[in-house]
C-alpha cells in the first residue's frame, strides 16, 4: 500500500521530500518571499502538492502547517519535555520581537535593514540598548556587534530573515517572521479576554 502511494506521487515531490523534511524538521520555515531559489522552489512544490505532503508527514507523526506565505512542521503528539522546550524558545522570541519592534515598529515581513544601522541605533537609544543587553545575557554576549550577530544568526536559522547584500550587510525579513508576530498577537488577545477574579 505504501509503495503504491509513493509511486503515485508527483516526481517533484519524491525528489524534494527529503530536502523539505531536513529543513522543516530542524524548526526552519520555508517562505514564499525567500531570496534563496532553493527555498522558493521547495515552498512552491509544497504549495502545488499540499495534500500529498500533508498526508506523507502525517504518516510519520508530523503536521504540515501553513501561514501567510510560509510552511513549517509541528508534531501531532508531543511529550512534556518537547512542550517545555517550545515554551522556552517562544519566550526567547517574545524578547526578540519586543527588541525588533522597539528598533522599528515597521519591522515585519518585507522590511529591509542594515546590520550597521541596527548596531548604531542600539548605541543611540537607551531603551533599545537595555533590551539588547537582556537578549543574550546568559550566553555572555556583550558588545552591540556580538548581540546583533547572534540575533541575525537566530533569525537566519529560523528562516525569519535573509542577507540580501553581503557588501553592505542588508537583511530582509521574510514572511515566516509573521509566525512570531501571530503567536504574540494570540497571547495578547488571550490576556485581554481573561476575566479578572
Cite the ranges covered by each PLM segment:
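Short amphipathic alpha-helical interaction segments
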Residues: 45-53, 140-157
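Short basic alpha-helical hairpin corresponding to helix-turn-helix/winged-helix-like nucleic-acid-binding
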Residues: 65-120
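Minor-groove-contacting beta-hairpin "wing" of winged helix-turn-helix DNA-binding domains
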Residues: 70-74, 168-174
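Eukaryotic partner-binding/assembly regions in large regulatory complexes
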Residues: 1-84
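Intrinsically disordered, low-complexity, charge-dense segments enriched in Lys/Arg
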Residues: 152, 164-167, 174-179
Amino acid at each position: 500500500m505504501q509503495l503504491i502511494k509513493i509511486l503515485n506521487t508527483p516526481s517533484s515531490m519524491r525528489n524534494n521530500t527529503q530536502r523539505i523534511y531536513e529543513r522543516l524538521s530542524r524548526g526552519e520555515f520555508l517562505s514564499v518571499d525567500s531570496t534563496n531559489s532553493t527555498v522558493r522552489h521547495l515552498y512552491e512544490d509544497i504549495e502545488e502538492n499540499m495534500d500529498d505532503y500533508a498526508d506523507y508527514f502525517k504518516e510519520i507523526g508530523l503536521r504540515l502547517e501553513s501561514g501567510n506565505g510560509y510552511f513549517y512542521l509541528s508534531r501531532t503528539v508531543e511529550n512534556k519535555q518537547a512542550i517545555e522546550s517550545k515554551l522556552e524558545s517562544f519566550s526567547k522570541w517574545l524578547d526578540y520581537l519586543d527588541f525588533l519592534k522597539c528598533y522599528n515598529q515597521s519591522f515585519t515581513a518585507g522590511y529591509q535593514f542594515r546590520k550597521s544601522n541596527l548596531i548604531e541605533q542600539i548605541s543611540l537609544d537607551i531603551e533599545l540598548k537595555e533590551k539588547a543587553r537582556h537578549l543574550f545575557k546568559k550566553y555572555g554576549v556583550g558588545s552591540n556587534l556580538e548581540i546583533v550577530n547572534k540575533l541575525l544568526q537566530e533569525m537566519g536559522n529560523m528562516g525569519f530573515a535573509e542577507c540580501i547584500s553581503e557588501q553592505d550587510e542588508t537583511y530582509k525579513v521574510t514572511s515566516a517572521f509573521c509566525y512570531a508576530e501571530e503567536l504574540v498577537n494570540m497571547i495578547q488577545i488571550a490576556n485581554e479576554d481573561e476575566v479578572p477574579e
